[in-house]
Amino acid sequence: MAPVAAAKIPTEWHQTGMAAKAVSSRLRASIYRALDRAGPCSRRTASRFFRYCYCSMAVQGKQGSLSLPPVAKEGLAMYNQNRKEGTPMNIVVLDGGTTNPGDLSWEPLERLGRLTVYGQTPQGLAVQRLEDAQAVILNRLSLGREEFSRLPKLRYVGTLATGYNTIDVKAARERGITVCNVPHYCEEAVAQHALSLLLCLCNKVQRSAGMVRDGHWAQAVEESHLSLSPVALAGKRLGIVGYGSTGQRMAALGLALGMEVLLFSRREKQAPAGCRWVGLETLFQESDAVSLHCPLTEETRGLVGRKLLALMKPTAFLINTARGALVDELALAEALDQGRLAGAGLDVLTQEPPEPGNPLLSAQNCVITPHVAWAAKEARERLIRIVAENLRRYQEGRPQNVVS
């Protein structure tokens, strides 16, 4: 057999399997041989792994000279070892109560190993509860370099969320620990919640309902033409910062209400009629409501501060269902209390739960919900299903949604 020609597999995980179709049968044989070296596996497992090649696989000159990426090799080796020895993977869910308070099933994860579920875990007990864990599933707890150094058996971290800012991804990568998130599971629920916050502010729901509860029905009716006058959204401008899947759904809701939608994102993409791409400052200047749907990164931390808030109309609203640290909370509270902003609807804060002295807790026209926009039952069911699928694919040596 002639030497296998050098080949380059794209560095991204190919769920479509297009990479497999472009590779010769000789390279396929080389992949099988490399898999055999990683551990005994069925032809079916090897074929599945081949179709979803992960990272770079370099074929060097001689036939059969192929190296598997460490993350795939480790996952496949662990899967084969556990299968051979008949020992299931130790899987620990540290704070399952935030996702499943008892109304859902953990069965998708139970099928993958020996599962231990804690409803809540104090941060100080995390390492103790993970001493024998090979895989951990968590939502809001933090795992950093110190914790990883004390957990030699840990090989996998799965987040019960899209965001993973509580995980030190760099430290995990250095220790060969794979981290996976769930990028798409609650877009509809979060967009719906963002709209509900906006409608609550526009229709003065909290204040008018409170007046009725306190026995001031007639006064509430009288003020409905004055301070309690609703704001009609049709014809107004909705600014959306971040045009990912949730931002796109929020845009669709705005269009359905007859609003013009202004968009800002790192990368512009095709948008429906009624949407217009603008610069960030223009968006804050021209919008009657601004809704944040961008990720929290070093570049976006504190994005909405005094400068952008000063550009907003005094009749405008700010909605944040993304991450609390996107907003300078002191600057926002000052803008609300000084009447430079009509209202804010927040589902997220920089610190959760907030300290009693957080100025937003007493700010004028500020509606705060406790980070529950994502929590629709349908979204949580989807979340558990994808978390289990992430782990299953890691066990088979073909991980998905890898962020480490």
Residue ranges with predicted function:
Residues Y243-G244:
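Glycine-rich Rossmann-fold phosphate-binding loop(s) that bind the pyrophosphate
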Residues G247-Q248:
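N-terminal Rossmann-fold NAD(P) dinucleotide-binding loop
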Residues R382-S404:
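NAD(P)-dependent dehydrogenase/reductase Rossmann-like domain
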